[in-house]
Amino acid sequence: MKSMLLRDSVKKASQFQRSLHSDPNQAKILLEERRKLLEEANSSADENDSHSMATIKSHFERLKRDEQLLNGVLKKYDAKQEVLSPEELRDAQNFLEMQEANSLDNSIRGTNELLERAYATREDFDYQNSVLGNVTNRINGAAMSIPFINQILRKTSIRRRRDSIILALLISVLMLLFLFFH
Protein backbone atom coordinates (compact mmCIF):
# COMPACT_ATOMS: atom_id res chain seq x y z
CA MET A 1 0.00 0.00 0.00
CA LYS A 2 2.85 2.35 0.85
CA SER A 3 4.47 1.80 -2.54
CA MET A 4 1.17 2.54 -4.26
CA LEU A 5 0.84 5.78 -2.30
CA LEU A 6 4.39 6.77 -3.23
CA ARG A 7 3.72 5.92 -6.88
CA ASP A 8 0.61 8.13 -6.80
CA SER A 9 2.69 10.86 -5.18
CA VAL A 10 5.21 10.66 -8.02
CA LYS A 11 2.37 10.91 -10.56
CA LYS A 12 1.05 13.98 -8.76
CA ALA A 13 4.58 15.45 -8.82
CA SER A 14 4.83 15.03 -12.59
CA GLN A 15 1.36 16.55 -13.06
CA PHE A 16 2.47 19.40 -10.80
CA GLN A 17 5.51 20.05 -12.99
CA ARG A 18 3.36 20.12 -16.13
CA SER A 19 0.73 22.46 -14.70
CA LEU A 20 2.99 24.74 -12.66
CA HIS A 21 3.37 27.54 -15.21
CA SER A 22 0.14 27.04 -17.13
CA ASP A 23 -2.26 26.81 -14.17
CA PRO A 24 -0.70 27.59 -10.77
CA ASN A 25 -4.03 27.08 -8.97
CA GLN A 26 -4.26 23.51 -10.28
CA ALA A 27 -0.64 23.00 -9.24
CA LYS A 28 -1.54 24.14 -5.72
CA ILE A 29 -4.37 21.58 -5.54
CA LEU A 30 -2.03 18.83 -6.79
CA LEU A 31 0.52 19.81 -4.15
CA GLU A 32 -2.08 19.49 -1.38
CA GLU A 33 -3.18 16.07 -2.68
CA ARG A 34 0.44 15.00 -2.79
CA ARG A 35 0.99 16.11 0.81
CA LYS A 36 -2.02 14.01 1.92
CA LEU A 37 -0.67 10.96 0.07
CA LEU A 38 2.76 11.35 1.65
CA GLU A 39 1.32 11.79 5.14
CA GLU A 40 -0.73 8.63 4.65
CA ALA A 41 2.35 6.75 3.41
CA ASN A 42 4.31 8.06 6.38
CA SER A 43 1.66 6.86 8.84
CA SER A 44 1.57 3.38 7.27
CA ALA A 45 5.37 3.04 7.07
CA ASP A 46 7.34 0.77 9.37
CA GLU A 47 9.67 2.90 11.50
CA ASN A 48 12.24 0.07 11.68
CA ASP A 49 12.63 0.03 7.90
CA SER A 50 15.30 2.66 7.32
CA HIS A 51 15.06 2.42 3.52
CA SER A 52 11.35 3.25 3.42
CA MET A 53 11.79 6.04 5.96
CA ALA A 54 14.61 7.54 3.87
CA THR A 55 12.44 7.27 0.75
CA ILE A 56 9.53 9.02 2.41
CA LYS A 57 11.87 11.67 3.81
CA SER A 58 13.25 12.39 0.33
CA HIS A 59 9.67 12.65 -1.01
CA PHE A 60 8.86 15.19 1.71
CA GLU A 61 12.00 17.17 0.88
CA ARG A 62 10.99 17.28 -2.77
CA LEU A 63 7.51 18.36 -1.71
CA LYS A 64 9.02 21.26 0.26
CA ARG A 65 11.12 22.29 -2.76
CA ASP A 66 8.03 22.17 -4.97
CA GLU A 67 6.09 24.27 -2.45
CA GLN A 68 8.84 26.88 -2.51
CA LEU A 69 8.82 26.80 -6.30
CA LEU A 70 5.04 27.22 -6.37
CA ASN A 71 5.24 30.17 -3.98
CA GLY A 72 7.80 31.83 -6.25
CA VAL A 73 5.68 31.21 -9.34
CA LEU A 74 2.55 32.52 -7.61
CA LYS A 75 4.40 35.68 -6.54
CA LYS A 76 5.64 36.28 -10.08
CA TYR A 77 2.21 35.47 -11.50
CA ASP A 78 0.51 37.93 -9.14
CA ALA A 79 3.14 40.59 -9.84
CA LYS A 80 2.66 40.20 -13.59
CA GLN A 81 -1.09 40.48 -13.31
CA GLU A 82 -0.82 43.61 -11.20
CA VAL A 83 1.73 45.31 -13.44
CA LEU A 84 0.57 44.19 -16.88
CA SER A 85 -2.68 45.00 -18.58
CA PRO A 86 -4.60 42.10 -20.15
CA GLU A 87 -3.18 42.95 -23.58
CA GLU A 88 0.37 43.07 -22.25
CA LEU A 89 -0.20 39.80 -20.42
CA ARG A 90 -1.45 38.22 -23.66
CA ASP A 91 1.59 39.59 -25.51
CA ALA A 92 3.90 38.20 -22.82
CA GLN A 93 2.22 34.79 -23.07
CA ASN A 94 2.56 34.89 -26.87
CA PHE A 95 6.23 35.78 -26.50
CA LEU A 96 6.79 32.85 -24.13
CA GLU A 97 4.97 30.53 -26.53
CA MET A 98 7.18 31.77 -29.38
CA GLN A 99 10.28 31.10 -27.29
CA GLU A 100 9.04 27.59 -26.55
CA ALA A 101 8.30 27.01 -30.25
CA ASN A 102 11.82 28.20 -31.14
CA SER A 103 13.27 25.88 -28.53
CA LEU A 104 11.32 22.96 -30.01
CA ASP A 105 12.47 23.90 -33.52
CA ASN A 106 16.08 23.96 -32.32
CA SER A 107 15.78 20.55 -30.70
CA ILE A 108 14.14 19.12 -33.84
CA ARG A 109 16.92 20.62 -35.95
CA GLY A 110 19.53 19.08 -33.65
CA THR A 111 17.81 15.70 -33.85
CA ASN A 112 17.71 15.91 -37.66
CA GLU A 113 21.43 16.72 -37.76
CA LEU A 114 22.16 13.77 -35.50
CA LEU A 115 20.12 11.47 -37.74
CA GLU A 116 21.91 12.77 -40.85
CA ARG A 117 25.27 12.01 -39.23
CA ALA A 118 24.05 8.53 -38.28
CA TYR A 119 22.93 7.83 -41.85
CA ALA A 120 26.25 9.12 -43.22
CA THR A 121 28.14 6.87 -40.80
CA ARG A 122 26.00 3.93 -41.87
CA GLU A 123 26.77 4.64 -45.53
CA ASP A 124 30.49 4.80 -44.69
CA PHE A 125 30.28 1.44 -42.93
CA ASP A 126 28.46 -0.08 -45.91
CA TYR A 127 31.13 1.28 -48.26
CA GLN A 128 33.93 -0.08 -46.05
CA ASN A 129 32.17 -3.45 -45.91
CA SER A 130 31.95 -3.63 -49.70
CA VAL A 131 35.63 -2.61 -50.08
CA LEU A 132 36.73 -5.25 -47.57
CA GLY A 133 34.52 -7.82 -49.31
CA ASN A 134 36.18 -7.02 -52.65
CA VAL A 135 39.66 -7.27 -51.09
CA THR A 136 38.77 -10.63 -49.54
CA ASN A 137 37.44 -11.94 -52.85
CA ARG A 138 40.59 -10.84 -54.69
CA ILE A 139 42.87 -12.44 -52.10
CA ASN A 140 40.86 -15.67 -52.20
CA GLY A 141 40.89 -15.61 -56.00
CA ALA A 142 44.66 -15.15 -56.03
CA ALA A 143 45.13 -17.86 -53.42
CA MET A 144 42.95 -20.31 -55.34
CA SER A 145 44.99 -19.81 -58.50
CA ILE A 146 48.14 -21.07 -56.77
CA PRO A 147 47.77 -24.87 -56.36
CA PHE A 148 49.80 -25.34 -53.16
CA ILE A 149 48.05 -22.52 -51.24
CA ASN A 150 44.67 -23.71 -52.53
CA GLN A 151 45.23 -27.17 -50.96
CA ILE A 152 46.36 -25.69 -47.64
CA LEU A 153 43.29 -23.45 -47.46
CA ARG A 154 40.97 -26.38 -48.20
CA LYS A 155 42.59 -28.53 -45.52
CA THR A 156 42.41 -25.67 -43.04
CA SER A 157 38.71 -25.12 -43.66
CA ILE A 158 38.03 -28.88 -43.42
CA ARG A 159 39.93 -29.04 -40.11
CA ARG A 160 38.02 -26.04 -38.80
CA ARG A 161 34.70 -27.64 -39.66
CA ARG A 162 35.76 -30.96 -38.15
CA ASP A 163 37.09 -29.25 -35.02
CA SER A 164 33.98 -27.13 -34.64
CA ILE A 165 31.73 -30.20 -35.00
CA ILE A 166 33.76 -32.11 -32.40
CA LEU A 167 33.73 -29.14 -30.04
CA ALA A 168 29.97 -28.69 -30.46
CA LEU A 169 29.32 -32.37 -29.74
CA LEU A 170 31.55 -32.27 -26.65
CA ILE A 171 29.81 -29.17 -25.29
CA SER A 172 26.35 -30.64 -25.90
CA VAL A 173 27.26 -33.94 -24.18
CA LEU A 174 28.67 -32.07 -21.18
CA MET A 175 25.56 -29.88 -21.00
CA LEU A 176 23.30 -32.94 -21.09
CA LEU A 177 25.34 -34.62 -18.35
CA PHE A 178 25.19 -31.46 -16.29
CA LEU A 179 21.41 -31.22 -16.70
CA PHE A 180 20.86 -34.88 -15.81
CA PHE A 181 23.05 -34.91 -12.70
CA HIS A 182 22.22 -31.47 -11.38
From Swiss-Prot:
The chain crosses the membrane at residues 164-181. This is Protein transport protein gos1. Signal peptide: none annotated. GO terms for biological process: endoplasmic reticulum to Golgi vesicle-mediated transport; inter-Golgi cisterna vesicle-mediated transport; intracellular protein transport; vesicle fusion. The keyword Transmembrane helix applies. InterPro entries: Golgi_SNAP_su1. Nonessential SNARE involved in retrograde transport within the Golgi complex.
